[in-house]
UniProtKB/Swiss-Prot annotation:
Organism: Rhizobium meliloti (strain 1021) (Ensifer meliloti)
Family: Belongs to the GroES chaperonin family.
Signal peptide: none
A Pfam match: Cpn10
Record protein name field: Co-chaperonin GroES 1
Entries under SMART domains matching the protein: Cpn10 (SM00883)
UniProt keyword terms in alphabetical order: Chaperone, Cytoplasm, Stress response
Top-level lineage group: Bacteria
Gene this protein is translated from: groES1
Keyword Heme: no
Lineage of source species: Bacteria, Pseudomonadati, Pseudomonadota, Alphaproteobacteria, Hyphomicrobiales
Gene Ontology BP term (one): chaperone cofactor-dependent protein refolding
UniProt function note: Together with the chaperonin GroEL, plays an essential role in assisting protein folding. The GroEL-GroES system forms a nano-cage that allows encapsulation of the non-native substrate proteins and provides a physical environment optimized to promote and accelerate protein folding. GroES binds to the apical surface of the GroEL ring, thereby capping the opening of the GroEL channel.
Length: 98
């Protein structure tokens, strides 16, 4: 996993999408224009956490290296060090795989 020098703030995470399959199980090659963006990714970096009502920082439940599922429209696409990544809030994450 390549490290990034970008540190998200608060309850945000930086996610690298997992590459989708180039072929179907039947062997049909899927062109880039027909591929759906995967809704699965690996967390690259995490923020320090959100603050609760008393001002205490609540750490995130996820960590760098976790493989996650997220919503189709979750996050903001950014390019960091030439790599396409997503920045999203922890609340946009549906769950951790594995």
């Amino acid at each position: 996993m390549a490290s990034t020098n970008f540190r998200p703030l608060h309850d945000r995470v930086v996610v690298r999408r997992v590459e989708s399959e180039e072929k179907t199980k039947g062997g049909i090659i899927i062109p880039d224009t027909a591929k759906e963006k995967p809704q699965e990714g690996e967390i690259v970096a995490v923020g320090s956490g959100a603050r609760d009502e008393s001002g205490k920082v609540v750490p995130l439940d996820v960590k760098a290296g976790d493989r996650i599922l997220f919503g189709k429209w979750s996050g903001t696409e950014v390019k960091i060090n030439g790599e396409d990544l997503l920045i999203m809030k922890e609340a946009d994450i549906m769950g951790v795989i594995g």
